[in-house]
Design a protein with these regions (language model features):
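Class II aminoacyl-tRNA synthetase catalytic cores and aaRS-like
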Residues: 1-172
Length: 172
């Protein structure tokens, strides 16, 4: 087939439906960029932010993504409204500043917890972290919504399209 399009496709990666949903939030993920969902449920389990700790103790997840962009408050509000359409109850965020993590929620975390969150996301100055606390399925769908909206606010630059196959679909 490569002779028809004058392009060598190479090996096509295969990922399971479960991996696609847990890592990308979609059964049709754009895997050409590195915006992966990260689970911080283990960090949030005992934190002082009850929205997170109560969700984890109730069997839910706290998951998030990092946008390599200093997102404005207006854009955060827009993202919050948009993820609500996907069933999210809210959208927590932390901005990475030269002084460290900054947000209305940081006061509920210990320095060690904040350090672990920053490390989990490999976050640096100028990044904005977004979190959703909910059941696993809803946290995945919310990430897909944020990914789409991040194109509009400039926090995402897609690379070349990457072919892949998704297999082992859930029976639902």
């Amino acid at each position: 087939m490569s002779h028809l399009i004058n392009y060598e496709i190479g090996e096509v990666p295969v990922i399971t439906y479960e991996d696609a949903m847990s890592r990308y939030g979609s059964d049709k993920p754009d895997i050409s960029f590195g915006m992966l969902i990260k689970d911080i449920s283990d960090i949030a389990d005992d934190c002082g932010f009850k929205v997170f700790s109560d969700t984890v103790r109730g069997g839910g997840k706290v998951r998030g993504i990092v946008l390599n962009e200093d997102v404005s408050r207006k854009d955060i509000d827009m993202l919050t409204q948009e993820v609500a359409k996907f069933g999210a109850k809210g959208l927590a965020w932390i901005k990475m500043t030269a002084e460290g993590p900054s947000s209305v929620i940081t006061k509920f975390f210990t320095q060690k917890e904040l350090s672990n969150i920053v490390s989990r996301f490999d976050a640096t100055v100028g990044d904005t972290l977004f979190f959703v606390a909910d059941d696993e399925k809803d946290t995945a769908y919310t990430k897909d919504a944020i990914t789409g909206l991040s194109q509009e606010i400039g926090g995402f630059t897609p690379g070349a399209h990457t072919l892949h196959a998704v297999c082992s679909f859930d029976a639902e």
